[in-house]
Amino acid sequence: IQKACELGLQHSTHLYCAMSGVIKNGPQREGGVIESTLLMDHLTTEVIADGQHLPAELLKLAVKCKGFDRLAVVTDAQRGAGMPDGIYAFGSKNGTKSIVKNGVATTPDNTGYASSTIQMNQAIRVMRDLADVPLVEAIKMASLVPARIIGVDDQLGSLEVGKIADLVLFNQTIDVHK
């Protein structure tokens, strides 16, 4: 990871998902992608906050290591998001088959998740309820932080004069008003 950082790496996606942890090299051990991402202050990262991919402890560890300003909340939602149980494609245009049951998308053999089916308001709720993140910080992690990561925070991500005002209204339980 250090070499990648020297070449310009600034962000890692989907913290903990398909990432190496501690690597054993003979009698020695070295940190993998997970440990590097958590320890390197200049790296930003994101968590799939669906309440399935990561337990509360891993969400809390990510928040503790990265803070509210370097950790983005993503849904990683696929085509089955907000849809009834069934078979949906995920990934590329033609996609790979996934099974959505009780709101959870898995591979057909049920050995892994196939993206997620949550919407952003649900991800914010997960961060508040499972990771004990204050609501205002969870909203920032779903708006300003991602905008900053992709370099559009001068236009999006917060309510400020001169920025695009994308507003979503929700109630106390973070259900979106239509």
Segments and roles (model prediction):
Residues 1-31, 82:
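Histidine/acidic-residue-rich, glycine-tolerant segments that coordinate divalent metal ions
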Residues 174-178:
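Short, Lys/Arg- and Gly-enriched loop/turn segments at beta-strand edges
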